Curated annotation (Swiss-Prot):
The lineage of its organism: Bacteria, Bacillati, Actinomycetota, Actinomycetes, Micrococcales. This is Small ribosomal subunit protein uS2. Gene3D superfamilies: Glucose-6-phosphate isomerase like protein, domain 1 (3.40.50.10490), Helix hairpin bin (1.10.287.610). The gene is rpsB. GO terms for cellular component: cytosolic small ribosomal subunit. Residues 246-259 have a biased composition (Basic and acidic residues). Residues 260-294 have a biased composition (Low complexity). It comes from Arthrobacter sp. (strain FB24). Belongs to the universal ribosomal protein uS2 family. It holds the Pfam family Ribosomal_S2. Keywords: Ribonucleoprotein, Ribosomal protein.
Amino acid sequence: MPVVTMRQLLDSGVHFGHQTRRWNPKMKRFIFTERNGIYIIDLQQSLSYIDRAYEFVKATVAHGGTVLFVGTKKQAQESIAEQATRVGQPYVNQRWLGGMLTNFQTVSKRIQRMKELEEIDFDDVAGSAYTKKELLLLRRELTKLETNLGGIRNLTKAPSVLWIVDTKKEHLAVDEAKKLNIPVVAILDTNCDPDEVDFPIPGNDDAIRSVNLLTRVVADAVAEGLIARNQRATGTTEAPEEPLAEWERELLEGSKSEEAAAPAAAEEAPAAAEEAPAAAEATESAAGEADAAK
């Protein structure tokens, strides 16, 4: 079964790139055509690269790896936090602090400081060893730490993989990952540099629905990897008898429904494949809206 369908990519606007004047020539091989001054990404290639990235993330997690979800732009913040939390992975969705990977020892100290502040009962002024003003300052410090480091509170070492939304905005994360030889899986819009990414996924990194879809796909890969890891640890290949976590149950139920719909999907596949060129013809009005949004 495919990880994601052509119809899902089209409906989410994954094929819309940037304006033709804002592009990276290295992305030329991923571009299908141009409409109303906007590049249209080749979704056939996107499907192939999604499958490749999915298998890599799944295998990495199955062997004990951790995926750090990174996306601080407004369109990605909610999806990054939601999907990473769903599969128990760390995330950064507010601000990338310089040295978060390359100077992880210092970051770990700040995380420890955050956990210490969380032990304070800020409402019990009389029972604490602090004055009201000191408690106010400590609460502000805690709020700032939770905003910047809350998503990586359980990260004890450098992650195995980075999932990044918008490599241009998250260039600090990309640079640090390259220094530590950490593989990067990322959405590549038409203004990005594909040479910076180990597992690129050509697509729209500005539309909320596109970011949501691709981030969910990566989270599903993590979920499958965690299930495989658990089965390897228990020496079983069947689903465990104990109650499954919510994300495991959703994933397995989703797999069953996809298998049940396989015959219908097989009939729709040829039609969906033909929709990619047709979509390019039908995007004139939508491309105009995307132009205004960019």
